[in-house]
A protein has these predicted regions:
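N-terminal nucleic-acid-engaging modules of covalent nucleotidyltransferase systems
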Residues: 1-139
Length: 139
């Protein structure tokens, strides 16, 4: 079964120990998973979006679209400072962001909405856990 990024993080958050959570993240490693953790926890990342969540229409949970975030995560660069998209007008950026989150699995969309405000929806997936799982991220 193809797991979405939010699903992997939710599963890890339910595990009892830090070591189990770290191992689960390593076992389900994917560039998009690492990038989610990096964009959430790295102090140099600044999102170029308002703090409030935009109005959007979430997809149906029944749709099998957990892979969309994994395959389209490169689009997130458009919403972060210093990633070659700083000159995009704010209104255009916000419109592109709405289109992006509307294309995602509803759980992955909620995850992106949280990390843009530097918050992880699962308290057990801390910066410490991310750092132990993926020390190369420089967290």
């Amino acid at each position: 079964m193809n797991k979405g990024i939010a699903e992997i993080l939710a599963e890890a958050s339910k595990m009892e120990t830090v070591e189990e959570r770290v191992e689960h993240l390593k076992k389900n490693d994917h560039p998009s998973l690492q990038t989610v953790l990096y964009y959430c926890y790295h102090p140099s990342i600044t999102w170029l979006l308002p703090d409030t969540n935009p109005p959007y229409k979430p997809r149906l949970k029944e749709e099998d679209i957990q892979n969309v975030l994994k395959s389209d995560f490169r689009k997130v660069r458009m919403f972060v400072e210093g990633k070659d998209y700083d000159n995009v007008k704010p209104i255009k950026r916000e419109m592109l962001f709405i289109e992006f989150i509307e294309s995602l699995d509803p759980d992955d969309a909620k995850l992106i909405l949280s990390i843009k405000n530097k918050k992880m929806p699962w308290k057990n997936i801390s910066r410490h856990v991310a750092k132990k799982a993926f020390p190369g991220l420089g967290l």
